[in-house]
Curated annotation (Swiss-Prot):
Its cofactor is Zn(2+). Zn(2+) binds at H22, H26. GO terms for cellular component: plasma membrane. Belongs to the peptidase M50B family. NCBIfam families: PRK10779.1 (NF008046), RIP metalloprotease RseP (TIGR00054). Its EC number is 3.4.24.-. GO terms for molecular function: metal ion binding; metalloendopeptidase activity. GO terms for biological process: cellular stress response to acid chemical; proteolysis; response to temperature stimulus. Pfam families: PDZ_6, Peptidase_M50. It comes from the Bacteria. Residues 22-103, 397-429 are periplasmic. It is a multi-pass membrane protein. It comes from Salmonella typhimurium (strain 14028s / SGSC 2262). This is Regulator of sigma-E protease RseP.
Length: 450
């Protein structure tokens, strides 16, 4: 319950910030163009708070925080007094109206740059993309990429950490192949390797793009050495102690902790013959895992904690810049996200990305809560990502979105007169139906993931 409330709070804050930014873009440019703004509302429905400024603009925070709007004086909506007609939106030039409409998405892009600027000034921790293991017969194995090498670039784009690698790999969905530059860790002697992506079975909502290629990042090492044995557990009853190294299980040599976990999990209530090393001496013990029900299935449980060797400092990175350099980095990062978003939307349309990858408010709320738990840096990066998505989606040429209004203005400019109200009304209805269908699909996908 607490996690749901946390996710909801983080989601509402994120939505409030991004909607305010978007609508403020419309509001600010409208004011600059001499348009009278009658209402600036965050949310829909019953007003929870309102005030009116000296220009006659009413500011509202409403009950349902799923959007917002800026209401401008417009003769098409209601009669306007003669002395105020020059302040009506419909009486402004095509260029001014286009600027007002485009200002919302542009404000979202500027906010993303600002958020990343803060992130890069604070400093972004990361891990150098050094490969720990390669899965046999995987795409990475077929490209002859070796463990211990570092991924320096993907298709010529530098990848200083794993997040950068993931961002570039996601953009390759639907492509036939991609080229990665690798080098031994600590060296810059690069080699180019070609990844064959024709049979890349990657689903963004379920998998990590790196692991789906058969690459396991170098991380903290988990040794088959016990750091803790829980009291009254199966391991304690078997005589295991902290510091014991497990050498063999049922006669099979053990070099990886996960292999021991698999043995225990798959043998509930069954004796396992262990050979261990304790303070230089070899011992033989018998472990009978306790039985626990997990999702209706019996699994073994030993009650031990392994020894974890932290990642060495030379594998860690921090991207931190001065105020001016941070602007350049933030702009570049935002541009990369914009290109990725457009690419992914295009691949949704062409079918290269499945429609079940479309996410709705529930997935966004979960992302908001998770990023907020990790800290302010990750929450800012989440806000930047959603802000870019909001800006791009609003530029789609659907009549109910900013992009649709811009399309009508472009037609008006070309033909020398506005699109007829009949055509506009029909287009709005079609656009509304399409938008509702997309939202319904996104919600269906959200619920199917729960």
């Amino acid at each position: 319950m607490l996690s749901i409330l946390w996710n909801l709070a983080a989601f509402i804050i994120a939505l409030g910030v991004l909607i305010t930014v978007h609508e403020f873009g419309h509001f600010w440019v409208a004011r600059r163009c001499g348009v009278r703004v009658e209402r600036f509302s965050i949310g829909f429905g019953k007003a929870l708070w309102r005030r009116t400024d000296r220009y006659g603009t009413e500011y509202v925070i409403a009950l349902i925080p799923l959007g917002g709007y800026v209401k401008m004086l417009d003769e098409r909506a209601e009669p306007v007094a003669p002395e105020l007609r020059r302040h009506a939106f419909n009486n402004k030039t095509v260029g001014q109206r286009a600027a007002i409409i485009a200002a919302g998405p542009v404000a979202n892009f500027i906010f993303a740059i600002f958020a990343y600027w803060l992130v890069f000034i604070i400093g972004v921790p990361g891990v150098r993309p050094v490969i720990g293991e390669i899965t046999p017969n995987s795409i990475a194995a077929q490209a002859q990429i070796a463990p211990g090498t570092e991924l320096k670039a993907v298709d010529g784009i530098e990848t200083p950490d794993w997040d950068a690698v993931r961002l570039q790999l996601v953009s390759k969905i639907g492509d036939q192949q991609t080229t990665v530059s690798v080098a031994p860790f600590g060296s810059d002697q690069r080699q180019d390797k070609t990844l064959d992506l024709r049979h890349w079975a990657f689903e963004p909502d379920k998998q990590d793009p790196v692991s789906s290629l058969g690459i396991r990042p170098r991380g903290p090492q988990i040794e088959p050495v016990l750091s803790e044995v829980q009291a009254n557990s199966a391991a304690s009853k078997a005589g295991l102690q902290a510091g014991d190294r497990i050498v063999k299980v049922d006669g099979q040599p053990l070099t990886q902790w996960m292999k021991f976990v698999t043995f225990v999990r798959d043998n509930p209530g069954k004796p396992l013959a262990l050979e261990i090393e304790r303070q230089g001496s070899a011992l033989s013990l018998t472990l009978t895992p306790d039985t626990k029900s997990v999702n209706g299935k019996a699994e073994g449980f030993a009650g031990v904690v392994p020894k974890i060797i932290p990642l060495p400092e030379e594998y860690k990175t921090i991207r931190q810049y001065g105020p001016f350099s941070a602007i350049l980095e933030a702009t570049d990062k935002t541009w990369q996200l914009m290109k990725l978003t457009v690419s992914m939307l295009g691949k949704l349309i062409t079918g290269d990305v499945k429609l079940n990858n479309l996410s709705g408010p529930i997935s966004i709320a979960q992302g908001a809560g998770m990023s907020a738990e990790f800290g302010v840096i990750y929450y800012l990066m989440f806000l930047a990502l959603i802000s870019v998505n909001l800006g791009i989606i609003n530029l789609f040429p659907l009549p109910v979105l900013d992009g649709g209004h811009l399309l009508f203005l472009a037609i008006e400019k070309l033909k020398g007169g506005p699109v007829s109200e009949r055509v506009q009304d029909f287009s709005y209805r079609i656009g509304s139906i399409l938008l509702v269908l997309l939202m319904g699909l996104a919600l269906f996908n959200d619920f199917s993931r729960l």
